């Protein structure tokens, strides 16, 4: 059984695109960031969906490129006292939850996520309170406040296994916030899942008819899909998985042409993993609609070179992540529960959006 809690779909205002830098400006800010990282005893951790030049700089300076949970775990193991998180705000919060002793900075605290915005804590708390018999499972793409209300936090790479486990115990589930991932998990597990009606503004735009036309142009191509995409798109996939799972699939699939339905920021690491393969973005327009995100998160795009330099240089309330200690402790409980479960399964937890 799968039900949908239907809230009004929101159209979120996108941030202004960063002013493009010329070649000299890019070189200036790259060198400035390298200097500031050393001066601030900081390490740059970047999400797969940031722009390629940011991912390259993270690797060049000894940082990492990963999903949000792995970014936080990398920061925990790194000796630097400061983490500069290039991503969206919930990723900075997750890093702070897992690394309370470290300073966590972001290029901007205004880099949002539609899944986070679409799950306000007051409304979600009321929803959970109206279904007290259900176990609350929230995706990593949520605020610290929402995580603190959950029994479990989960990433896309372990979602099916966790829901199957809870279903085997006879538990009924509240799933939040992504309706497409919730539907995918319910279909795979057969569990009783009540879904919050959120969606990723990037993955929600992938279209089946346009994808079918593209597949007709490249009949030998494999289709790789993130499960935050609509179910009809997922059904067309040769491989479905989290960010890290899609990169692994790109390496192992025999096809030399890949159509990829996720944020195009992933192409930087995916092309590294399989330099001999040709990658295409899955279409996000068609069927009477134009794209808004066009396969790239507008909030991820806020993590530019100038913004990173300003975050390191200025710090302060405009860039520093703060999570109340009581809230942090509450959010840490479901996060640790997931990590312990994963260790029991001997699975490596990676792969929220």
Swiss-Prot record:
Its main location: cytoplasm. [4Fe-4S] cluster binds at residues 113, 200, 297. SUPFAM superfamilies: NadA-like. InterPro entries: NadA, NadA_sf, Quinolinate_synth_A_type1. The keyword Repressor does not apply. Binds 1 [4Fe-4S] cluster per subunit. GO terms for biological process: 'de novo' NAD biosynthetic process from L-aspartate. Iminosuccinate binds at residues 47, 68, 139-141, 156, 226-228, 243. Keywords: 4Fe-4S, Cytoplasm, Iron, Iron-sulfur, Metal-binding, Pyridine nucleotide biosynthesis, Transferase. It is found in: Cytoplasm. GO terms for cellular component: cytosol. NCBIfam families: nadA (TIGR00550), PRK09375.1-1 (NF006877), PRK09375.1-2 (NF006878). Catalyzes the condensation of iminoaspartate with dihydroxyacetone phosphate to form quinolinate. This is Quinolinate synthase.
């Amino acid at each position: 059984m799968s039900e949908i809690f239907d809230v009004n779909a929101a159209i979120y205002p996108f941030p202004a695109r960063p002013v493009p830098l010329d070649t000299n400006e890019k070189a200036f800010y790259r060198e400035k960031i390298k200097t500031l990282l050393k001066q601030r005893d900081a390490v740059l951790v970047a999400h797969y969906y940031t722009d390629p030049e940011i991912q390259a700089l993270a690797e060049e300076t000894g940082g990492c490129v990963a999903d949000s949970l792995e970014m936080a775990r990398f920061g925990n193991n790194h000796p630097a006292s400061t983490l500069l998180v290039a991503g969206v705000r919930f990723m900075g919060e997750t890093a702070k939850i897992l690394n309370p002793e470290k300073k966590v900075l972001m290029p901007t605290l205004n880099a949002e996520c539609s899944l986070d915005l679409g799950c306000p804590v007051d409304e979600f708390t009321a929803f959970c309170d109206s279904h007290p018999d259900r176990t609350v499972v929230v995706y990593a793409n949520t605020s610290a406040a929402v995580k603190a209300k959950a029994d479990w936090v989960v990433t896309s790479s372990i979602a099916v296994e966790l829901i199957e486990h809870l279903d085997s115990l006879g538990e009924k589930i509240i799933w939040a916030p992504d309706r497409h991932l919730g539907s995918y998990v319910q279909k795979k597990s057969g569990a009783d899942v009540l879904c919050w009606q959120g969606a990723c503004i990037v993955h929600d735009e992938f279209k089946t008819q346009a994808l079918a036309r593209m597949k007709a142009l490249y009949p030998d191509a494999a289709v790789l899909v993130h499960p935050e995409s609509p179910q009809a798109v997922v059904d067309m996939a040769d491989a479905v998985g989290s960010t890290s799972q899609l990169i692994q699939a790109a390496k192992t699939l025999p096809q030399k042409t890949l159509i990829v339905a996720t944020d195009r920021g992933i192409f930087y690491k995916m092309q590294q993993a399989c330099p001999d393969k040709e990658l295409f973005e899955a279409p996000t327009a068609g069927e009477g609609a134009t794209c808004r995100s066009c396969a790239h998160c507008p909030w991820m795009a806020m993590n530019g070179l100038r913004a990173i330099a300003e975050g390191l240089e200025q710090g302060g309330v405009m860039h520093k992540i703060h999570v109340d200690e009581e809230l942090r402790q509450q959010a840490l409980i479901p996060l640790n529960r997931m990590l312990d479960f994963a260790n029991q399964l001997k699975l490596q937890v990676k792969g929220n959006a």
